[in-house]
Amino acid sequence: MLAPGESVLIPAEEISLSAGDVISLSVHNLIASVSSYRPWWSEFLAFGSIDRPSSFSPAVSRVKLNLHHFAVNYVLLTAASITLFLIGDPMALVTVASFVAMWLLLYFYRDHPLVLYGRHISDRVIVFGLILGSLWALWFINSLQCLILGVVTSVLLCLVHAIIRNSDDLFVQEKDVVVPSNFLHWS
């Protein structure tokens, strides 16, 4: 029997989801993330907004803003570039695509802990396994040169786009806007 001032903490039951449920939720989170954060391609490829920056300082500010605003588009462009460079080696393409999918589903877009055979798998074990698997895959595919060329090409394309894309007509997120007010300012 408890005294009137005492309380007992009842542990909440942990929700254990199967590996299939975790992956299904991860796929759902991935699709929701890509569809909600990606600016439309018509905005990305707006030819009326392309001009040369006047100096180095505006170019740097354009790069910062465009990299932030078009981040998902640049990731998709990088994936397309890597795919084009690896298309000549289907085994390498399938291997890289499967490891990218594993990283996305098992690490980046997973909300709940992964449970295998009734045991929780920690994030450290998942990251360690994904890193080892990715390094093994890069060694196994023997197409590291094509992969590096794809990444370098996409980085150059993204950088050129970020420099020449005028960022004046981009929509500003409300949370990023700070409106200065002199309401409580005493001079």
Swiss-Prot record:
Entries under Pfam families matching the protein: PRA1
Coiled coil: none
Transmembrane segments: 84-104, 125-145, 146-166
Subcellular compartments: Endosome membrane
Tissue expr: Expressed in roots and lateral roots.
Cellular compartments per GO CC: endoplasmic reticulum; endosome membrane
UniProt main location, coarse: membrane
Record GO biological process: vesicle-mediated transport
UniProt entry keywords in alphabetical sequence: Endosome, Membrane, Transmembrane, Transmembrane helix, Transport
Superkingdom of origin organism: Eukaryota
Topology with respect to the bilayer: Multi-pass membrane protein
Function: May be involved in both secretory and endocytic intracellular trafficking in the endosomal/prevacuolar compartments.
Protein family membership: Belongs to the PRA1 family.
The protein's name: PRA1 family protein G1
Organism: Arabidopsis thaliana (Mouse-ear cress)
Gene: PRA1G1
